């Protein structure tokens, strides 16, 4: 469910081995999703998901939006369908309760770009059945991913460790008047990271990064908030810490 980078990347990955239906909120979003995912049926009516065995929600990282979506899914899907969310920052237990079927609910936290990133963090409410856990572990295997079960805690493992590091890089930029390229090059060549922290923030999206930071209790740097106010959200907006051209 969704038409963003995570939803479309997951749909492309799954379409190699599964019949895939992509739900989009509007006709415009559906057209965009159709351009990004060739081997999938794109729909705008939730009822069209009724025949799906597993539905993975990848809408905006907003608690109210996600709770409402899971409530609606719980009403239209058959009782044996598994509902999963791509969140890592919101309470899995609360979203599961909103769906009305916590026994058939789990978190399937994939990473962008989905086609290249091997890890999936799996998290479940206490009420999740062993069958549900097994089905999502098996789905990860069929997608060519490594599923690791983690506690239902804000940020899970990766984001809880990652975002304080990313924000520390921004504070270094603010405090020491060092160029973004210098920080990123140091971390790529010195620590072996494939991407520097500031380029990674641009890739994630500064608005998304701020939302995740707030949800896990990390102190979001003022520089990030200023860039968001300026509309410099990162790569998707053409500018963030860096300038981008198509």
Predicted feature residues:
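Rossmann-like dinucleotide-binding cores of NAD(P)H-dependent redox enzymes
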Residues: 22-39, 124-132, 147, 154-162
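Rossmann-fold dinucleotide-binding core
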Residues: 82-151, 159
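NAD(P)-dependent Rossmann-like dehydrogenase/reductase catalytic/cofactor-binding core
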Residues: 3-5, 10-13, 25, 131, ...
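NAD(P)+-binding Rossmann beta1-loop-alpha1 motif at the extreme N-terminus of oxidoreductases
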Residues: 1-41, 76
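Amphipathic alpha-helical segments at domain termini/boundaries
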Residues: 39-54, 135-145, 151-152
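Rossmann-fold NAD(P) dinucleotide-binding segment
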Residues: 45-105
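Flexible helical/loop "lid" subdomain adjacent to adenine-nucleotide binding pockets
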Residues: 161-177
């Amino acid at each position: 469910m969704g038409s963003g980078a995570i939803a479309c990347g997951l749909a492309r990955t799954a379409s190699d081995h599964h019949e895939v239906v992509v739900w989009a909120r509007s006709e415009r979003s559906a057209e965009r999703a159709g351009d990004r995912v060739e081997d999938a049926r794109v729909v705008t009516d939730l009822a069209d998901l009724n025949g799906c065995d597993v539905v993975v929600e990848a809408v905006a990282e907003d608690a109210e939006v996600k709770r409402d979506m899971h409530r609606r899914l719980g009403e239209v899907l058959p009782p044996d369908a598994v509902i999963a969310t791509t969140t890592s920052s919101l309470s899995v237990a609360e979203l599961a309760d909103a769906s009305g079927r916590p026994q058939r609910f789990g978190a399937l936290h994939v990473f962008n770009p989905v086609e290249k990133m091997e890890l999936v963090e799996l998290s479940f409410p206490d009420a999740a059945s062993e069958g549900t856990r097994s089905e999502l572990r098996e789905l990860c295997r069929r997608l060519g991913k490594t599923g690791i079960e983690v506690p239902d805690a804000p940020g899970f493992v990766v984001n809880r460790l990652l975002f304080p590091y990313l924000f520390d890089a921004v504070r270094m930029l603010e405090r020491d008047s060092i160029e973004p390229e210098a920080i990123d090059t140091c971390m790529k060549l010195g620590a072996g990271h494939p991407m520097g922290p500031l380029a990674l923030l641009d890739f994630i999206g500064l608005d998304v990064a701020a939302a995740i930071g707030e949800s896990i209790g990390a102190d979001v740097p003022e520089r990030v908030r200023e860039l968001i106010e300026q509309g410099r959200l990162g790569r998707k907006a053409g500018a963030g810490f860096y300038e981008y051209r198509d």
